[in-house]
Curated annotation (Swiss-Prot):
A motif (DEGH box) lies at residues 300-303. Residues 506-663 form the Helicase C-terminal domain. Its main location: nucleus. The keyword Cell cycle applies. This is DNA repair and recombination protein RAD54-like. Keywords: ATP-binding, Cell cycle, Cell division, DNA damage, DNA repair, DNA-binding, Helicase, Hydrolase, Meiosis, Mitosis, Nucleotide-binding, Nucleus, Phosphoprotein.
Length: 791
């Protein structure tokens, strides 16, 4: 008997259990029969719905439906029927071929085609195949037809005309199109885009060739350690991530060996086909890298290979590759033996052996340069020079940075002669008159002794600031026995006093004016880290933001420091740079003013350092200031630099740049000093355009800052200076005695990189290539500049 009229809970439970799924094999027999009857009823309802919509019977359809629909989803069933129709190829009488009529692994004959369109606008074609007739094409094997080699439009659209010529020149050299050799020397001056040209060459050779396949499978770029990261950035920048490079920076020895072995052993396609490595790392692991063949090697800052006896040169010579490219932004400025080493590296035996070269060229050329040489010896020297130029001109290309005047803002260069302060003057004269200098001259027979070289360095430090020789004064070293009384009583060596140095006083005034005038940034360069310490003290005293790069900074940190300084939003006002550590390859376009605080014996080093700001990407007018102490040894160094650049060629230079080769007469001139003259350099020029140190005739309009100093503007006062900052500092500091200045071009002409494409089209049509700066023969006595007799 039921206790309540409510539904029975047992009925609810049975209903729930009946609706739950149970595998058919586990169901009882009578339950399976009931579900079968239920399905039959459902099928009958679905048939009625199909007849209603005019659909085919799903059970008799040629294509079964992927899912089963209930009576309530007839509309969905209609849509599914449309989607499930069999696809029919829209070609009459089409018979499908499932591969039964051909063998596996047989490749169809494919007609070779160039990777890029040679007829496209602004296309740079490096290889032009023969013009085949139609009859020849029909009889030739389509798989053996040569195709065009066309530079990727990604690069050809941004290459400037001189860069297009450079890429074509290097390609023809490494592919043996110019002769029986496969190497070349890219000797363009700084800022002309040697890196971009090499990136273009590497990318082209890795991707294509006349036979419609890559010419090389891997390449190695060897550079100074400070530039390895820069090369990686350049590849990423120009190729936009299309090529991954293997940059060897740091890491354990075991990991380095493993990575280099994997790179060397792999002969097929590599994920990172370009190895970026420093000279030092290559020398250490040369045994691994020289085991297997490499498609091409590029040596940046190649003047490091001027000595064929060093270990790095010999290690690179052991590399198994015939394609060698050497980059050097500075011309060869020393002896012919160094020049032979560079040419012999890229093209072995082009000039024969070292003994053959000396016998055939070097002896005759050097003999003709002697002051007591005969007319016949001079004539033979010129003939041998021209013969040598004819040989090496096939594999050397050099363009000057005058090309940049089309694309960059105007640049002003100024050589500023600064008077010594009273303290500097007394220290300088005391040292020159000391027994130390007399003994140095007496001990010097044919070449400078080590003592004389140390004395030269001491004089250079006095010209910069007395702080640099303070310890010598306190210790009463030779030459400074009587100099303690020269320093003032309130002298504190750890606190910078700009007023005790003429150059520091001028620098202090100019930095303050630049800081107050606007948002210009400044690069300060010196050959001595001690001078950088003084720069740092001055910056802290004036509360200038600064960064410093010298030899103690790691490679990874250098790139971060450069990026920070170049950031327009950065608070860094000064970039302090050691010319020995970072004078090559750095891009400091965040600044537009540069101070070269002390000169180097080698003009190439100064040129490299001063080219850091006037480069691609610079938007402001640039000002380059070279500071030298008037009448001192610094002016003598400047004169030797000027003499070297004006009378030397890229092949022949009998006047060597190193101070280790000064004779006694040279040292007597270096240790001379006249404190009354405004500029010893201007006096020795015997300038005919100036009367009593006042310029009466301007230089020719065709001259620029690459011309000889005698063809620059000469100023003995601040009138006519191109820089208002310097003009004001001249008045305020009262320590400037003379200024030489000139500009890079007559007027400011800036072209965007995009405009290079239009100019390139006209260049391609010209039959004459861009004029290259070719080495000149040795100058005879009567061919020298008349205004330069004193140097």
């Amino acid at each position: 008997m039921r206790r309540s009229l409510a539904p029975s809970q047992r009925i609810g439970q049975s209903t729930a259990s009946r609706n739950a799924f149970t595998p058919p094999l586990l169901q009882k027999k009578n339950k399976r029969a009931c579900q079968k009857d239920l399905r039959l009823d459902t099928d009958a309802d679905e048939d009625k719905e199909r007849k209603r919509f005019g659909l085919r019977d799903a059970t008799n359809s040629e294509i079964p439906l992927p899912i089963r629909f209930t009576a309530n989803s007839a509309y969905e069933l209609a849509i599914a029927q449309v989607l499930a129709r069999k696809f029919k190829v829209p070609i009459d009488n089409y018979v499908p071929d499932y591969g039964g009529n051909r063998c596996l692994g047989v490749r169809r004959v494919v007609v070779r085609r160039p990777l890029h369109d040679p007829q496209a606008c602004n296309a740079l074609v490096l290889f032009q195949p023969p013009n085949y007739t139609e009859h020849e094409r029909m009889s030739m094997d389509p798989s053996k037809v040569l195709v065009h080699v066309v530079v990727d439009p990604l690069l050809s659209n941004i290459l400037r005309p001189h860069q297009r010529e450079g890429v074509r020149f290097m390609y023809e050299c490494v592919e043996g199109k110019k002769g029986d050799f496969n190497g070349c020397i890219m000797a363009d001056e700084m800022g002309l885009g040697k890196t971009l040209q090499c990136v273009t060459l590497v990318w082209t050779l890795l991707r294509q060739g006349p036979e419609s396949k890559p010419t090389i499978n891997k390449a190695i770029v060897v550079s100074p350690s400070s530039l390895v990261k820069n090369w990686e950035k350049e590849f990423t920048k120009w190729l936009q991530g299309r090529l991954l490079c293997l940059a060897m920076e740091g890491g354990t020895k075991e990991n380095t060996i493993r990575v280099l072995e994997q790179f060397s052993m792999t002969s097929s396609k590599l994920g990172t086909p370009v190895l970026l490595i420093s000279y030092e790392t290559f020398r250490i692991y040369a045994e691994i890298l020289c085991k297997y063949e490499v498609g091409m090697v590029i040596c940046d800052e190649g003047h490091r290979l001027k000595n064929s006896d060093n270990l790095t040169y010999q290690a690179l010579m052991g590399l198994k590759t015939k394609r060698r490219v050497l980059l050097s932004g500075t011309p060869i400025q020393n002896d012919l033996t160094e020049y032979f080493s560079l040419v012999n590296f890229v093209n072995p035996e082009m000039l024969g052996t070292a003994a053959d070269f000396k016998r055939n060229f070097e002896n005759s050329i050097l003999r003709g340069q002697n002051a007591d040489s005969t007319e016949g010896e001079r004539k033979k020297a010129i003939e041998k020079t021209q013969e040598l130029i004819g040989l090496v001109d096939q594999c050397i290309i050099r363009r000057t940075n005058q090309i940049l005047t089309k694309y960059l803002p105007i640049k002003f260069e100024m050589v500023i002669c600064v008077k010594l302060t009273a303290i500097q003057l007394q220290l300088y004269t005391n040292f020159l008159n000391s027994d130390q200098v007399r003994r140095s001259l007496a001990d010097c027979n044919e070449k400078a002794s080590l003592t004389a070289l140390a004395d030269i360095t001491t004089l250079k430090k006095i010209c910069s600031h007395p702080d640099l020789i303070h310890q010598k004064i306190e210790a009463k070293e030779k030459g400074f026995e009587n100099s303690q009384n020269v320093l003032p009583s309130n002298y504190k060596p750890k606190e910078i006093c700009p007023e005790w140095s003429g150059k520091f006083m001028l620098l202090d005034f100019m930095l303050a004016a630049i800081r107050a005038a606007g948002n210009d940034k400044v690069v300060l360069i010196s050959n001595y880290t001690q001078t950088l310490d003084l720069f740092e003290q001055l910056a802290r005293k004036r509360k200038y933001g600064f960064v410093r790069l010298d030899g103690t900074m790691s490679i990874k940190k250098r790139s971060k420091v450069v990026d920070k300084f170049n950031d327009p939003d950065s608070e860094c006002f000064l970039f302090m740079l050691s010319s020995k550590a970072g004078g090559c390859g750095l891009n400091l376009i965040g600044a537009n003013r540069l101070f070269m605080f002390d000169p180097d014996w080698n003009p190439a080093n100064d040129e490299q350092a001063m080219a850091r700001v006037w480069r691609d990407g610079q938007k402001k007018p640039c000002y380059i200031y070279r500071l030298v102490a008037s009448g001192t040894i610094e002016e003598k160094i400047l004169q030797r630099q000027t003499h070297k650049k004006s009378l030397s060629s890229t092949i022949i230079d009998n006047n060597e740049s190193s101070e280790k080769h000064f004779t006694r007469d040279d040292l007597k001139d270096l240790f001379s000093f006249d404190q009354k003259i405004l500029s010893d350099t201007h006096e020795k020029l015997k300038c005919k355009r100036c009367v009593q140190n006042i310029q009466t005739k301007p230089p020719s309009e065709s001259t620029d800052c690459t011309s000889h100093l005698s063809q620059w503007y000469h100023c003995s006062n601040n009138r006519g200076l191109p820089d208002s900052i310097l003009a004001q500092a001249w008045t305020d500091s009262k320590c400037v005695s003379f200024v030489f200045h000139h500009r890079s071009q007559a007027k400011e002409v800036v072209e965007s990189p995009e405009s290079a494409a239009a100019e390139a089209e006209s260049v391609e049509e010209e039959s004459q290539p861009t004029q290259r700066k070719r080495p000149s023969p040795p100058l005879s006595d009567d061919s020298a500049d008349e205004d330069f007799i004193g140097f």
